[in-house]
Every structure is written in structure tokens, then in C-alpha cells.
Amino acid sequence: MSRSSKKGPYVDIKLLDKIEAMNKANEKRAIRTWSRDSTIFPQMIGHTILVHDGRRHVPVYITENMVGHKLGEFAPTRFFRGHGGKKADKRGKVK
């Protein structure tokens, strides 16, 4: 179920304040955040935000197509390494 339309989109206030301050100063530097549930606003376009994935911060460059999505969508938390497949023989040769 999605968020109620009467509430409006959620964005972390501290993150939005940092973005607006950087826009006023006309500077571009990476912002580190743990707020994966924040919605991407048009003011964020052109900035790089380091989104935490549980282990490290993943750099996410915000483009126009990302507006309306959540920051966490662009920093995956689970990495699929593949299913079993053919196991190597003790001699090191696959048959």
C-alpha cells in the first residue's frame, strides 16, 4: 500500500535542508544519508547522494527520471551471487 495522497511525499528534513543550502551556495558535493525512504524531489537533480545499503554508502547521482522515486530504490541491499551449478571436481576439473 502506498502513502496517502493527502499526507504528501516524505523526505528527511535534514537532507532537504542540506540540498537547499547547497543549491543557494551553488556547490556540488556528495551528501551522506541513511534515509532510504526519502522521496526524490526536483531540487535534488544534479546532486550526488551517498545512500546507505546496510554495509556501505552507495553513490547515487540524481537525474530527472528519478524524481518521485525513493532513494533506497537505487542502492540495492541484497546481492545475488548465483545458484549452485556444476561443482569442481577434487582434481580441479569440471566434467
Swiss-Prot record:
GO terms for molecular function: rRNA binding; structural constituent of ribosome. The keyword Membrane does not apply. It comes from the Bacteria. Keywords: Ribonucleoprotein, Ribosomal protein, RNA-binding, rRNA-binding. One of its GO terms (biological process) is translation. Belongs to the universal ribosomal protein uS19 family. Protein S19 forms a complex with S13 that binds strongly to the 16S ribosomal RNA. HAMAP family: Ribosomal_uS19. This is Small ribosomal subunit protein uS19. It comes from Chloroflexus aggregans (strain MD-66 / DSM 9485).
